[in-house]
Amino acid sequence: MVALYCGGGLRPLMLSWSRDLPCIWRALHTSAVCFKNRAARVRVGKGNKPVTYEEAHAPHYIAHRKGWLSLHTGNLDGEDHAAERTVEDVFLRKFMLGTFPGCLADQLILKRRANQVEICALVLRQLPAHKFYFLVGYSETLLSHFYKCPVRLHLQTVPSKVVYKYI
């Protein structure tokens, strides 16, 4: 709800959305503010929350203790299309999460080398091998046609999620 106040007098007026009156417009928003501040790290708990190596280290340790999850030359000085690469990365991550539901053990690593996109992932052994082969072929073919460049999936299977430590 917005209550508008005309600056000429002492009484507030409820006005319509027309701006025909020659006065100063002020708006009072009465809806609650929703602050969404979130840290980019895993919250410390009672020591019973399993985390991976990537999750255990804070973001300021990138390039010191952990690596980048997306490797490309878009962020170098003088290079274009950094925003497009970020949108493509988000799409690729969501596509892989949807294609392999509940099977990804860790974050994806996306590499762009020349005209080729490589996707590296740790996958849980929840599906039979022939279903994994089908999903790999399906993903590579669909993404290659979509991006008009070769897309390769490098998957490594693990029996369970790799736990680095408990926080």
UniProtKB/Swiss-Prot annotation:
UniProt lineage: Eukaryota, Metazoa, Chordata, Craniata, Vertebrata
Keyword Transit peptide in annotation: yes
Subunit organization: Component of the mitochondrial ribosome small subunit (28S) which comprises a 12S rRNA and about 30 distinct proteins.
Superkingdom, taxonomy of origin: Eukaryota
Pfam families linked to this entry: MRP-S24
GO terms for MF: structural constituent of ribosome
Biological processes, Gene Ontology terms: mitochondrial translation
Compartments, as annotated in UniProt: Mitochondrion
Similarity remark: Belongs to the universal ribosomal protein uS3 family.
Alphabetically ordered keywords of this record: Mitochondrion, Ribonucleoprotein, Ribosomal protein, Transit peptide
Transit sequence range: 1-35
CC annotations in GO: mitochondrial inner membrane; mitochondrial small ribosomal subunit
Alphabetical list of InterPro entries matching this protein: Ribosomal_uS3m (IPR026146)
Record protein name field: Small ribosomal subunit protein uS3m
